[in-house]
Amino acid sequence: MNEQHAQSDRPPTVRPMDFLLVTGLSGAGLQTAAKVLEDLGWYVADNLPPELISRMVDLSLESDSRLERLAVVIDVRSRLFTGDLGWVLTELESKPVHTRVLYLDASDEVLVRRFEQVRRSHPLSGGGAEGTLSEGIAAERDQLAKVKAAADLVIDTSSLAAHQLRQKIEDAFGDAENRTMQVTVQSFGFKYGLPMDADLVCDVRFLPNPHWIPELRPHTGQSADVRDYVLSQDGAEDYLATYHHLLDLTITGYRREGKRYMTIAVGCTGGKHRSVAMSEALAGRLGKDSGLNVRVVHRDLGRE
């Protein structure tokens, strides 16, 4: 008993804040990495001077709304960045943070092509004079050699598309919750207009309308009687199965391209009976996929 009491009086263990330093070669995908980390729930500070990193970590730890994950993107755009971050990492060792370094790399050939495609000069190319792009890349690569050697993870983006880089970053710095896809199944009535935010729209007006059955008319598609009536109609279950298969293919493709949010609109005439029942049934099928976070919204329910 005394031992249990002593344990309960101990202060709760505070989980160290995750701190990620993101750096690498210009044109290797630093901005893409920043956007992915933001989508994963990281607080991202872009191009922060190295001298301010330690102070920002302190402020993040002292804040009432303490950050759990902080990422700082730093590159040669900062005039104070000499490529030596050893002293910054040493300062962070005394703080309750779990520090990692991500370095993005790419081949000279790919970097030259990327800069030429966007028609921008390299930050170290001396103003973009002709013949200095390769020199700028070489100078930056030499300047960042120590950082690359100290990195916890080096990703070469030479042969990676944006969605492939996203996947690598998600695998390394995401968690199970943030890797799930957010799917909204929204019922609606066509007479009130199409949902503006829908990625896909399906029309279930081919099913008999419960509105014309007096005992069902007052109820909605959420009631057992209306639901059973709608789902028992010829073609209803086949339609759900076929559309679910189509969504499986679509969701797989969306995931591959890095899309993390999706809205599926299911419409009938007034958004009260058929679309509500079919939305609930479709969401139930989608909800069996552990990689999806599914919610149902009935946009026009109660408008009549």
UniProtKB/Swiss-Prot annotation:
Q: Which residues bind ATP?
A: G24, L25, S26, G27, A28, G29, L30, Q31
- The keyword Nucleotide-binding appears for this protein: yes
UniProt keyword terms in alphabetical order? ATP-binding, GTP-binding, Nucleotide-binding
Q: Name one GO molecular function term.
A: ATP binding
Binding, GTP: D75, V76, R77, S78
Q: Does the keyword tRNA-binding apply?
A: no
Pfam families (UniProt xref): PapZ_C, RapZ-like_N
Q: Which purpose does this protein serve, as stated in its record?
A: Displays ATPase and GTPase activities.
Q: Which family does it belong to?
A: Belongs to the RapZ-like family.
* HAMAP family linked to this entry: RapZ_like (MF_00636)
Its protein name is Nucleotide-binding protein ROP_69550
What organism is the protein native to?
Rhodococcus opacus (strain B4)
